[in-house]
């Protein structure tokens, strides 16, 4: 019975990790339909969550204060942009848009935090491949949209 429980728990863990990995693919692998506003909002809120996470990682490190401020600015700009898109595309009022964007950003922040924690446990790396990939993607996107680093 104990062996069956262990096998069941192991399978459940594997399945849940695969579901998380599937749902939290790198942004550069997300299929983008240029006319789908939901994708624009999703990507912008993911970038906002990423920059919030990066701000939290860097703000307490010696010599990283300026970089932490940059991440904080990018987080704020992406959050504002996502809320504006929610107002434009979803016809949300400003309070609803801010609330939904804040919740989504917090959820993505937690996903990045969990993802980085798993990477540290698995191979000792500070950042996961998803986090590294998304960081490059979001930095590129922000440069294209004239958000300076």
Where are the model-predicted features located?
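Short N-proximal segments of mature Sec-exported proteins
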Residues: 32-91
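Sec-dependent signal peptide recognition
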Residues: 2-10
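Compact alpha-helical subdomains of small soluble proteins
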Residues: 74-149
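Cleaved targeting-peptide boundary
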Residues: 20-29
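N-terminal signal peptide c-region/cleavage motif recognized by signal peptidases
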Residues: 16-18
């Amino acid at each position: 019975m104990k062996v069956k429980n262990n096998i069941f728990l192991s399978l459940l863990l594997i399945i849940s990790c695969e579901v998380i990995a599937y749902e939290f693919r790198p942004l550069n692998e997300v299929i983008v339909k240029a006319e789908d506003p939901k994708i624009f909002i999703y990507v912008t809120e993911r970038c906002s969550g990423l920059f919030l996470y990066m701000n939290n990682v860097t703000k307490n490190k010696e010599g990283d204060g300026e970089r932490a401020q940059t991440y904080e600015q990018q987080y704020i700009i992406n959050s504002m942009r996502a809320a504006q898109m929610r107002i434009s595309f979803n016809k949300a009022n400003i309070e609803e848009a801010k609330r939904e964007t804040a919740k989504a950003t917090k959820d993505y922040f937690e996903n990045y935090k969990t993802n980085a924690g798993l990477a540290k446990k698995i191979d000792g790396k500070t950042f996961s491949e998803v986090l590294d990939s998304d960081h490059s993607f979001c930095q590129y996107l922000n440069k294209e949209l004239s958000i300076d680093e």
